[in-house]
Every structure is written in C-alpha cells, then in structure tokens.
C-alpha cells in the first residue's frame, strides 16, 4: 500500500522512498507508542488515506508532527502546541484547537497592550527625576525594574513570511490547448488521447498516484517534452514560473544570498529596489542564515528560499509541483491566500487535499491506463462527482440487466376464500343435490 519497490536496494532509493521504507518499518513493528514526523510528505493521496485508516485502527498511542490539515482533522484527539518555547496541550480536535488558540492570542494581545501602557506611564514617572526621588517610593521603583525585566523577557510571535507577486502583463485568453495527446515512457502510457484547454485565470490542480506521471504531464504542457501523438499549443504573452518539488534549481554549495542573487546586494520587487538582507528577512531568514550554504538548511527553509526567489520574478502563469512539502503551517496558509488572490493562471500538483480544495477551480485526475479527466472543483468535489458517477453507472447496469431478462408470466393468484356465516351454511345444506 506504500508503493514500495520490493527488490530495490535501500541506498539506491530517493529520499522520499527512503521515508516510506522507514514509515513501513515503524508500522509493522506494532509499537505501544508510534512517533511520526511529517508522515504524509512524499506520499500520494491514496497512500495518505490508507495511512489514516490504518492509524485510526492502531491500538497504541500516536504522537505525530504534521502540517497536513486534513490528516490532523482526521486523526488528532489532542494538539500539543509549541509556541515561543512554551508547550501547551489542547484537548479535542484540530478545529477546536484553532478556535481556542485564537481566543488565547486575543487575550494575550489585550494583556500586553495594558502592560505596555502601564510600563509607559511608569517610565514617565521615573523620568521626572527629582520629584520621583522626593517621594522616596522605593517600592514603586522596584516594581518598575520588574516591569522592565518582564518586558525584556517577553517573546513576541514569530513574524510571518511576506508573500507578494510581481506585477505582470496579462496573457492571452487561451493559456494551453492540448488535442488528442499521447505520451508513453518505455512500456508505460502516461497520457492517452488527452484533450485539454486552459483559459486565463483558471487554477487547475493535478492529482494521482506517485509515479503516474504528474510531473511528466507538466513538462508536456509547458513544452519541455514533445508529445508522441497529438498537439499542444501554448498561448500568447505567457510569462511562466516553475516551482520544482525536487528543488533541483538550488545550488547546495552556494549561500542563501548567492542562490537569490549573484554579484548584487539588491533585488527589485514591483519596481522598488530592496536590499537582499531585508528581502530575505521577509522570508524569516536571519542574517546568520543568509550567509549559510543551502545544504545546511532544513527542507522548510529550502522551500522558503525557492519561494523568495520565485517572487523576485514577474509571471502570469505559475506552475507549482508539491509546494507544501516541509512548509510550516503559517507559510502554507499565506501561500494559499496568495494563490487564491493571484490574477494569473495556476497549475498545481499537490497531495495536500485541503490546499487543493482551497485554491483550485478544477482538477485533472489520473485514473489509470493513461486516462486523465478534468473535474470541476477540488479533491472533495472530485470524490463527490466520482461517487455520483459510480452510483449512476450501477443504476444503469441494474436497469440493463432487468431489461435483458425475458419477462415471466405472472403466477395466477389464488382466489380468496369466502367465509360463510352459520346461517348461510345451514341454507346451503338444505339445497337438494341433483
């Protein structure tokens, strides 16, 4: 169910496949306590659903880290929140946690505002100097010193990534037009007789099992691969940008700064020159991290660097291949908001069901043997349409079967027995028999 190649050497597997092997080892061990760190990364949707169902039946205790909101909603019965060095346990579902956390932050904000107001008033009092000393209110001075210490120790909420797209010229009305496309790799058919039209402003998701050819389809649609049959035409005035799930466009030996811009201290954002350090701070990189080699970064930091570099460019057609891998929840939600507001066209490959549901207008689904179909809406909409289609097909099949059977003559119904009254029976016995 994890789509693992049984005979492959572990050392020859990709990072994603190695994660799957380790996940499989953890599951078959049947431990009392199972610890999972981002288990849905690099899994396809089918595998994630299977994992959810498996873990729902798991008899032991489960402690997991995840940014996958659908996964959290399905499994979590308690949320442990690490915020500014403090662990807080929130009983209940993920949805209840979100509500309670928001309420706590609002209370904290009100408390901090009152605290800061009091501190400001006390600072005014102490600056009065001679007047303050004359009062000889040493207790008030000590209280002020404690207020200063408390303010110094306060840890503010971490800043949020600032995502802004560059202004770009509108593309032509038709972005992609594909007619009867076929592409085969060795003995495997990726797409067969695939016809598809994408219009300006549409946001289209792509889902399917791992290895089905989602990335290959993107390369076909972008003109990086030529179809073996059929034709693909790209629209006019397209400025395309590609977010690569493998992060192959990053130079691991170079620093964060040099991966963003070389031989320059500034980037241009919507016509405004901005210093590299200031720009990277918008993506939560400290000055220390900015000069570190990319190979020392975490997966989430590399993703943020790719986003930082992506948004230095202008584009009206954005292609994103698994952008949510390793992203923290805040950045993921900000990216989601940006894509919803994006005025251009979007092609999105993702295993994150919530992310797809919240961003796309229709979805291309790999359904086996090179068949790729388009459905209105996101993942949940596809499930609903698929269920309706299956029910309709079953209804049609049952009608066909009933019509194919010869009609049988109805069995004669026995006549109902008439019960006579005692007087009638007596009269009947008096009738002479001839």
State the predicted function of each range.
Residues 5, 136-139:
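Transmembrane helical bundles of ABC transporters
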Residues 140-161, 203:
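ABC transporter TMD-NBD coupling linker
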Residues 97, 107, 118, 136, ...:
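An intracellular "coupling" helix at the cytosolic face of ABC transporter transmembrane type-1 domains
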Residues 109, 116, 120-123, 127, ...:
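Alpha-helical coiled-coil heptad-repeat register
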Residues 130-132, 265-266:
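Short histidine/acidic/glycine/proline-rich micro-motifs that form metal-
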Residues 122-131, 145-146, 161-168, 175-177:
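Alpha-helical coupling/stalk and coiled-coil linker elements that connect catalytic or binding modules
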Residues 1-112, 163-434:
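ABC ATP-binding cassette signature C-motif
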């Amino acid at each position: 169910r994890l789509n693992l190649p049984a005979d492959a050497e572990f050392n020859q597997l990709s990072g994603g496949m190695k994660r799957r092997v380790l996940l499989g080892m953890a599951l078959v061990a049947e431990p009392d306590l199972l610890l999972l760190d981002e288990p849905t990364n690099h899994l396809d949707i089918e595998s994630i659903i299977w994992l959810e169902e498996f873990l729902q039946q798991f008899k032991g205790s489960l402690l997991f880290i995840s940014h996958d909101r659908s996964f959290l909603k399905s499994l979590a019965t308690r949320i442990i929140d690490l915020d500014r060095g403090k662990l807080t346990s929130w009983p209940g579902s993920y949805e209840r946690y979100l509500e309670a956390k928001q309420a706590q932050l609002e209370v904290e904000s009100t408390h901090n505002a009152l605290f800061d107001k009091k501190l400001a008033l006390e600072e005014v009092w102490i600056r009065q100097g001679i007047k303050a000393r004359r009062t000889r209110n040493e207790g008030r001075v000590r209280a002020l010193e404690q207020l200063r210490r408390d303010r110094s120790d306060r840890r503010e909420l971490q800043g949020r990534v600032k995502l802004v797209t560059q202004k770009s010229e509108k593309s032509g009305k038709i972005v992609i037009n594909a007619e009867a496309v076929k592409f085969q790799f060795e003995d495997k058919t990726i797409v067969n007789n695939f016809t598809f039209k994408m219009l300006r402003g549409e946001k289209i998701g792509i889902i399917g099992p791992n290895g089905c050819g989602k990335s290959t389809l993107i390369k076909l649609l972008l003109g990086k691969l030529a179809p073996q049959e059929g034709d693909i035409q790209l629209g006019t005035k397209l400025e395309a940008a590609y977010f690569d799930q493998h992060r192959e466009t990053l130079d691991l030996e170079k620093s964060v700064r040099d991966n963003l811009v070389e031989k320059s201290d500034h980037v241009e954002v919507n016509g405004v020159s901005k210093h590299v350090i200031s720009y990277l701070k918008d993506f939560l990189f400290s000055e220390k991290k900015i000069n570190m080699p990319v190979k020392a970064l975490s997966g989430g930091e590399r993703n943020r660097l790719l986003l930082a570099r992506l948004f230095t460019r202008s584009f009206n057609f954005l292609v994103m291949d698994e952008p949510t891998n390793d992203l923290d929840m805040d950045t993921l939600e900000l990216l989601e908001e940006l894509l919803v507001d994006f005025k251009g066209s979007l092609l999105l490959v993702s295993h994150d069901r919530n992310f797809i549901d919240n961003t796309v207008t229709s979805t291309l689904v790999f359904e086996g043997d090179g068949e790729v179909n388009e459905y209105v809406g996101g993942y949940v909409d596809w499930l609903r349409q698929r269920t309706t289609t299956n029910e309709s097909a079953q209804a049609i099949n049952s009608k066909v079967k009933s019509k194919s059977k010869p009609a049988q003559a109805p069995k004669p119904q026995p006549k109902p027995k008439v019960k006579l009254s005692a007087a009638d029976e007596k009269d009947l016995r008096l009738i002479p028999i001839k």
